[in-house]
């Protein structure tokens, strides 16, 4: 299933950066926060680069379609749990985001087993950008000023809406596949 191309290697690298992020955050020091911000930004950058390269080089793989979103979720979930444990993020925000991410992951895996593979949508990409910006803001800015709170609320809203969009899009694809002449 793993195809050793640069986009897939970047996805694996992103997964490997997750423990470094957690260790840096949980050190709970100014230097640890700087390191965590750098690691998180670097890992997030690999998400954009691997997607761009996969499309530009026509090297999109099933591994990439499945593991790229999973790597994103691991990165975000690890950061959220770490920030909640440090009391730098409200637990309800993390729970809403994590619940959405887990639900979409379960739906994605179920769809794949049914032969339906759905890549990331524009809405999902916007959600990912907002989550990255929000997590970076919480890591970098202590005390959560109003603009960080607004960013977090917008992120939660878009996260929920993109989850609903994914669910209804998947349902539509399954219905099309099951319809007579729909390929299912």
In which residue ranges do the predicted regions lie?
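Membrane-interface helix caps of multi-pass small-molecule transporters
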Residues: 52-56, 110, 140
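Cytoplasmic-side transmembrane-helix entry/capping segments in multi-pass membrane proteins
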Residues: 67-71, 95-96, 121-127
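Membrane-embedded alpha-helical segments that form the functional core of polytopic membrane enzymes
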Residues: 17-63, 79-95, 148-160
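Short, conserved structural micro-motifs that define repeat-unit consensus positions
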Residues: 4-25, 72-80
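Alpha-helical membrane-protein architecture signal
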Residues: 35-38, 63, 67, 103, ...
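Membrane-helix boundary/interface segments in integral membrane proteins
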Residues: 100-116
